[in-house]
């Protein structure tokens, strides 16, 4: 868990971190689009369930729920390659 007061990355920053671990760069746009869709859907559900949340808070929670961007990127790198 992140330390209190440490800002969570935005959806775009999270996707960029994930793609930083995927060597086959032609797939970066597709990976970013899919991750963004999942994160935006999760954010929107959080906002529906808790209207008191700000958009930024809901986005931060959605990003945090995705876990470690390095670990995710390394796993995606295994399936997104040119060979």
Predicted stretch roles:
Residues 1-4, 45, 49-83:
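Cytosolic juxtamembrane regions of integral membrane proteins
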Residues 1-22:
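Short, charge-enriched, intrinsically disordered boundary segments that mark the beginning
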Residues 2-8, 30-36, 47:
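A short, ordered amphipathic alpha-helix with a cationic face
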